[in-house]
Amino acid sequence: MNKLSAVVLMLVACRTAAAVIEPTAPNAVDHVHGRAPLQLAIFSSHVEDIARQKGVSFAEAAAKVRTAGISGITVMDGLAADRIAAARNAGLAVACVVGWPEFEKGYDEAKCEALVSLAVSNGCHQVMLVPGFYPSAAEDAALFDVIVRRTRRFAAMAATRGVETLVEDFDDERSPTCGIRRTKAFLEAAPSVGFVYDTGNFNSPGERAESGLELLPRARHFHLKDRPAGDCRGSCAVGSGVVPIARIVSAARDAGYGGWFTIEHFGATNMLECVKASAAFLRAL
C-alpha cells in the first residue's frame, strides 16, 4: 500500500467514525424515511416524577430524559424558575407553557400576562390554556360564550408578543373542549386559537382517537397519549396501547406538520422506563 492510499483510507475511516458519533441536528432529514425526525417533548411534571421515583435531582432527571432522545419540555404553570433553567441546561427547549386561567370565574390580567411572559422569557412561542369549566357535565351556552370571549382576549394579547394560544380536547366532561363536537365548536368560535391534538382524549361514545384528524388544519401541537386495552383512562408507554399513534403521526406529517410532539403518561409508576419506550417507538416511525 502506498502513502497516498493509506491517507485516503485514513480519511474515509475518520469520516465514517464521525458519522457514527455525530448527533443528529434537530431539523436534519432522516434519509431512510425522507423526513425530519420528530421533535419530542415531555411534561415538566413527568420529569418531577422521574426525580421522585429514581431518587435524583430534577436536573439529573432532566439529563436522563435528554439522553432518552427527548429534546423539549412542556412547562406546567407554577414550575419553579430554577427547574426550568435546569431543564434548559440539560438541553431541553421549552416547547409549550400550560396554564389554567379559570376564565369561568373572570379574567385575571396579571396572571394572563405572566403566562405569556413565562413563555417569552424562555424562548417559547406557545401557551396552551385549559380555559375553564362548566359547573357540571351539562353544557352551558352562556358560560361557553364567556370562556370563549376571554380566550380570544388572551389570544389577542399573546399574539402581540409572538405567542400562539392553544386549547386541547380535554378529558373532563365539564370542559367546553371535551370531545370532538365541543372542541370543534370552541375552535370555530375562536378562530385565532390553535389546536393541541391529544390522541388519548377522544373517549366519548362514538368517538375514536382519529376523530381529531378533521381538526388537523388547526393543529399546532400534539400530546401523544396511549391507552391500555380496556382502560380508556389508563396510562401506558406510547406505542404499547390501543391508540393508533403511528397512523395519527403519519397523517400529521403527511399534512406538513413539523412541530412538537409531547409524550404523555400521567400516573405512570415507572416514568423513566415509559419515556424511554415512548421515545424509542416514536423515533422508529
Annotated model-derived regions:
Residues 20-125, 194, 283-284:
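N-terminal pre-domain/capping segments
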Residues 37-41, 72, 93-96, 125-128, ...:
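Structural preference for beta-strand elements that scaffold enzyme active sites
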Residues 43-47, 76-78, 99-103, 132-134, ...:
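Active-site beta-loop-alpha junctions enriched in small/polar residues
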Residues 65, 87, 119, 165, ...:
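Conserved, mostly hydrophobic/aromatic
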Residues 86-101, 148-158, 186-190, 245-248:
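Alpha-helix-loop-beta-strand connector modules within alpha/beta enzyme cores
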Residues 97, 156-242:
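Acidic/histidine-rich catalytic cores of soluble enzymes
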Residues 121-140, 161-172, 262-263:
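Active-site groove signature of glycoside hydrolases
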Residues 271-285:
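C-terminal helical cap(s) of enzyme catalytic domains, especially alpha/beta-barrels
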